[in-house]
Amino acid sequence: MNDELCISVTDKEKEEKILSVLGLCARSRELIMGVPQICDALGSEKKKGKGKYPLIIFESSDTSPNTHKRISDKCAYYKVKHIRLATDGGTLAQRLGKTSMLAAVAVTNKNLCLLAEKYI
């Protein structure tokens, strides 16, 4: 696995800011939520104007080892930055306005991606 593409965030202040940016992404509909949807989006070809492509992926801390490996392998293969948060899936879902748990979310907007990367 490519180590520079997988980062863990443990600082609470930075994580709060990242969660705020993810909330902004959710409100602007520039977020892909859920591991199957993220893997499908990564597998699809990048075509201009067709679909949304993940630029950075945020994973919750309580994902299973198989899910973590699945996300890590996809990120390494497609060269997408992968961030593991200290937040659990329930808190991540709550902060994004969802009722069920979320294992991972992906930002699809370049400018919002840069804003999130600023706090890593």
Where in the sequence are the language-model features?
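Short basic, glycine-rich beta-strand/loop surfaces that mediate nucleic-acid
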Residues: 78-120
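Signal for well-folded cores of large energy- and translation-related assemblies
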Residues: 43-46, 76, 97
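Feature captures the catalytic cores and cofactor-binding loops of soluble hydro-lyases/lyases
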Residues: 49-53, 63-93
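Acidic/histidine-rich catalytic cores and adjacent linkers
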Residues: 59
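Short, compositionally biased "basic patch" segments
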Residues: 1-21
